[in-house]
């Protein structure tokens, strides 16, 4: 008896399931399961989908606005806007539209690397910055006077003349408040302080100019003092007028050419030699 004489029956299930060619084919059918490096490694337990669903169910849900509350809020907002004037209402609507456009642009181009600031928003911001810069800053005692354009733009002789006129008008107007403080606390010390950077020749010219001013002031004060006295003159004196030499009015009886008759003897030689005494 030999092995060739034996008959082997082929199982009927071989037609439905193909025969594996190698051990690799067996593992290839189960691609979803990872291959363990050793038989001792335990397979990790897969998370149960039921646990994730239960956690999601326990999470608090955001309350969605009720349909009845939304029209009421919109109605109140519209009523507040309607109470404003046209200019303010248009400005609010324009800002709301701009904000809506920015939000839509951010949602649309958020992941494409587009600049975050919208061109319209950038233009609006630049306009507000220019308006803020154009407004003059409030002046205080701590504000440096050198920041004034009259000082910062000093270049030509005309600029210095304009500065001199502005300072003279502003400083001399303070004399009306207190002439004593103006003279003793401002003018004299100011002339001394501003003369320090000057040369000796310039100081001499300043003294000569002040001497001319002093003589003019003396003449004006003397004329004002004499004007108060009736008949006063600018040359001084007590203010009295000199009497003019005039003839007394004796009437028509006394004339130069009239002959006067005294009623006596005109012969003054009637005395004798013995009538001497």
From Swiss-Prot:
Residues 23-43, 267-277 have a biased composition (Acidic residues). InterPro entries: Acyl-CoA_DH_CS, eIF3-like_dom_sf, eIF3j. Its main location: cytoplasm. It is found in: Cytoplasm. GO terms for cellular component: eukaryotic 43S preinitiation complex; eukaryotic 48S preinitiation complex; eukaryotic translation initiation factor 3 complex. One of its GO terms (molecular function) is translation initiation factor activity. Residues 1-80, 257-277 are annotated as: Disordered. Keywords: Coiled coil, Cytoplasm, Initiation factor, Protein biosynthesis. Residues 199-230 form a coiled coil. GO terms for biological process: formation of cytoplasmic translation initiation complex. Residues 50-75 have a biased composition (Low complexity). Component of the eukaryotic translation initiation factor 3 (eIF-3) complex. Component of the eukaryotic translation initiation factor 3 (eIF-3) complex, which is involved in protein synthesis of a specialized repertoire of mRNAs and, together with other initiation factors, stimulates binding of mRNA and methionyl-tRNAi to the 40S ribosome. The eIF-3 complex specifically targets and initiates translation of a subset of mRNAs involved in cell proliferation. Belongs to the eIF-3 subunit J family. This is Eukaryotic translation initiation factor 3 subunit J. It comes from Kluyveromyces lactis (strain ATCC 8585 / CBS 2359 / DSM 70799 / NBRC 1267 / NRRL Y-1140 / WM37) (Yeast).
């Amino acid at each position: 008896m030999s092995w060739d004489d034996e008959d082997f029956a082929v199982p009927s299930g071989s037609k439905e399931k193909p025969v594996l060619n190698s051990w690799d084919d067996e593992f290839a059918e189960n691609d979803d399961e990872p291959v363990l490096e050793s038989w001792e490694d335990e397979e990790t337990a897969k998370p149960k989908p039921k646990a994730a669903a239960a956690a999601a169910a326990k999470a608090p849900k955001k309350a969605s606005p009720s349909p009845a509350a939304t029209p009421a809020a919109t109605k109140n907002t519209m009523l507040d806007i309607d109470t404003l004037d046209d200019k303010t209402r248009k400005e609010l609507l324009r800002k709301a539209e701009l904000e809506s456009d920015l939000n839509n642009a951010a949602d649309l181009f958020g992941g494409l690397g587009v600049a975050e600031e919208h061109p319209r928003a950038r233009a609006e911001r630049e306009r507000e910055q220019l308006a803020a810069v154009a407004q003059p800053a409030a002046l205080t005692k701590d504000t440096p006077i050198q920041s004034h354009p009259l000082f910062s733009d000093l270049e030509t002789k005309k600029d210095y003349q304009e500065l001199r006129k502005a300072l003279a008008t502003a400083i001399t107007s303070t004399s009306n408040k207190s002439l004593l403080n103006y003279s003793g606390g401002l003018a004299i010390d100011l002339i001394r302080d501003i003369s320090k950077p000057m040369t000796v020749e310039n100081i001499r010219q300043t003294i000569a100019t002040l001497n001319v001013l002093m003589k003019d002031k003396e003449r004006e004060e003397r004329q004002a003092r004499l004007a108060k006295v009736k008949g006063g003159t600018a040359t001084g004196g007590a203010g009295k007028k000199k009497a003019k030499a005039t003839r007394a009015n004796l009437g028509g009886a006394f004339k130069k050419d009239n002959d006067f008759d005294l009623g006596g003897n005109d012969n003054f030689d009637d005395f004798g030699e013995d009538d001497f005494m």
